[in-house]
């Protein structure tokens, strides 16, 4: 036991074991919805849902364990909400790449992230993207995720005259609306694991509605589903073009900003921050994140990143890797509960998707809307992400518009050289399309 304490940075004289374990459980409950949502999203590309569930649970366990041992911090990892939507609905369903090519892109992104972390280049990447655009990108992804949830449940449907309209009143759409309201109520009441409980409740409600289908001979516990359908399923040949290069760049910086933002935000005002305001062992935490992304791609899931829900465990008093270790153990246990999680209908996850969108939207209040040179590119970023149904297009158009507005309004010194180069490459891509 003493060896484990040392590996995770737990000092019994300084920290309370019960508090750390409770914090780990709290973190797991608040983020366990990913075990239902991620397979649901990625399976739209044709990936095997059972294999994706195993990949999700396994990569979450491994990534969180790496955080515990390398960084000794109370953070948990899992496939990113937002990037999984980018993977499925932009990269595969919109741009037309195979899911094998998308997995290859994620694997390469992880390797690049590892290199950037080892050589301390990540700071240059962070400085490349203007602060207001970072917040706008987060808000835009929030809108995008919510739109996906509503569309998949039939709450919003296609319409030739108005492009989109409200769908028909069906058991599926009804269950989705119930999930949205229930999720909102539980979060308002500050219930730990609100999204998880909402998904469970909607799955149960879906039984009499005929939405939740229970197969004959159902058993809640089984051996983990096979990884074979997704394990090492890479198509590297598809990466040899400009679109994929830009896509990998987008994945890298989304992962970096997601991780840095979560680490700094959740660790603020705790002893995990040093006197300069930096997160202790942040390099090790970033390295764990990068390795987990490549491991996740090998298993068969989209980018693994540090979850903002880790803040729930930290709020419960989690301060060391023991919190992360206990969360990791719970993800391993979840591997054997695949039948339960795979029973969850898509409509039951709509509430979680919409509420995650709402939480991500909160970053829009950080955008400086009084400065039009900042507000317009931010607005373009958010709007085009949703209207083009493409996160990458929104990011690209936001960066280009930011650079052009600053350049022609005489504020060209506010744009760094890296952003000029990136914007020029993005603009060239549109010209050559």
Feature locations, PLM:
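Residue-level signature of catalytic and energy-coupling elements of molecular machines
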Residues: 21, 41, 125, 193, ...
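Membrane-embedded alpha-helical modules
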Residues: 95-208, 325-433
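Loop-to-helix transition at the N-terminal end of transmembrane alpha-helices
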Residues: 45-65
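Transmembrane alpha-helix interface/packing and boundary motifs in multi-pass membrane proteins
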Residues: 63-76, 185-190, 251-258, 289-299, ...
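Helix-loop-helix hairpins and the membrane-proximal interhelical loops
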Residues: 1-51, 164-165, 197-283, 424-428
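Helix-loop-helix junctions within the multi-pass membrane cores of secondary transporters/permeases
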Residues: 2-38, 59-60, 80-89, 93-138, ...
């Amino acid at each position: 036991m003493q060896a484990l304490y040392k590996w995770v940075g737990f000092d019994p004289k300084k920290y309370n074991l019960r508090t750390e374990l409770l914090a780990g459980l709290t973190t797991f409950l608040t983020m366990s919805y990913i075990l239902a949502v991620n397979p649901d999203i990625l399976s739209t590309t044709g990936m095997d849902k059972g294999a994706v569930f195993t990949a999700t649970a396994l990569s979450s366990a491994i990534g969180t364990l790496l955080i515990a041992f390398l960084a000794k911090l109370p953070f948990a990892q899992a496939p990113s909400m937002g990037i999984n939507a980018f993977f499925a609905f932009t990269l595969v369903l919109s741009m037309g790449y195979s899911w094998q090519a998308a997995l290859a892109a994620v694997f390469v992104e992880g390797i690049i992230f590892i290199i950037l972390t080892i050589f301390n280049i990540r700071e240059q990447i962070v400085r490349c993207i203007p602060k207001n655009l970072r917040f706008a990108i987060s808000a835009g992804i929030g809108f995008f995720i919510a739109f996906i949830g509503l569309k998949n449940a039939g709450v919003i449907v296609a319409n030739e005259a108005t492009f989109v309209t409200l769908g028909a009143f069906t058991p599926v759409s009804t269950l989705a609306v119930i999930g949205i309201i229930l999720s909102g109520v539980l979060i308002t009441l500050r219930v730990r694991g609100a999204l998880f409980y909402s998904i469970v409740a909607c799955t149960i409600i879906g039984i009499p509605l005929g939405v939740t289908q229970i197969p004959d001979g159902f058993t809640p516990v089984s051996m983990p589903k096979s990884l074979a359908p997704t394990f090492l399923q890479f198509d590297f040949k598809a990466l040899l073009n400009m679109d994929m290069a830009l896509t990998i760049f987008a994945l890298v910086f989304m992962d970096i900003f997601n991780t840095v933002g979560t680490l700094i935000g959740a660790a603020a005002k705790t002893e995990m921050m040093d006197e300069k305001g930096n997160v202790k062992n942040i390099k090790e935490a970033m390295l764990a994140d990068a390795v987990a992304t490549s491991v996740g791609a090998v298993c068969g899931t989209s980018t693994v990143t540090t979850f903002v829900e880790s803040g729930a465990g930290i709020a419960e008093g989690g301060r060391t890797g023991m919190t992360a270790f206990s969360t990791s153990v719970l993800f391993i246990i979840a591997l054997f509960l695949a039948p339960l999680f795979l029973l969850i209908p898509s409509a039951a996850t709509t509430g979680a998707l919409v509420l995650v969108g709402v939480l991500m939207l909160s970053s829009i209040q950080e955008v400086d809307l009084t400065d039009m040179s900042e507000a317009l590119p931010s607005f373009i970023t958010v709007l085009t992400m949703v209207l083009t149904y493409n996160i990458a297009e929104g990011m690209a158009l936001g960066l280009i518009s930011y650079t052009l507005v600053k350049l022609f309004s005489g504020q060209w010194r506010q744009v760094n050289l890296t952003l000029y180069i990136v914007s020029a490459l993005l603009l060239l891509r549109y010209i050559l399309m």
